[in-house]
């Protein structure tokens, strides 16, 4: 149901934040500075 979807989304979000945090920050920085 919807609750399990929310759980999966939260878990995916945590995993992404942990694994992709550094990449995400670099991506945001390059977007802001138009260096991508």
Curated annotation (Swiss-Prot):
Subcellular location: Secreted
The UniProt record lists the keyword Nucleotide-binding: no
A single GO cellular-component term on record: extracellular region
Stored Pfam families: Antimicrobial_2
Record keyword Secreted present: yes
Tissue expression as described in the entry: Expressed by the skin glands.
Signal sequence interval, chain numbering: none
Disulfide bridges in this chain: 30-36
Gene Ontology terms describing biological process: defense response to bacterium
InterPro entries: Antimicrobial_frog_2
Keywords noted in UniProt: Amphibian defense peptide, Antibiotic, Antimicrobial, Disulfide bond, Secreted
Family to which the UniProt record says this protein belongs: Belongs to the frog skin active peptide (FSAP) family. Esculentin subfamily.
Protein's job: Antimicrobial peptide.
Protein name (record): Esculentin-2R
Source species of the chain: Pelophylax ridibundus (Marsh frog)
Lineage: Eukaryota, Metazoa, Chordata, Craniata, Vertebrata
């Amino acid at each position: 149901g919807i609750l399990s979807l929310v759980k999966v989304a939260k878990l995916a979000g945590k995993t992404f934040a942990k694994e992709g945090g550094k990449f995400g920050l670099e991506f945001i920085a390059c977007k802001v500075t138009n260096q991508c």
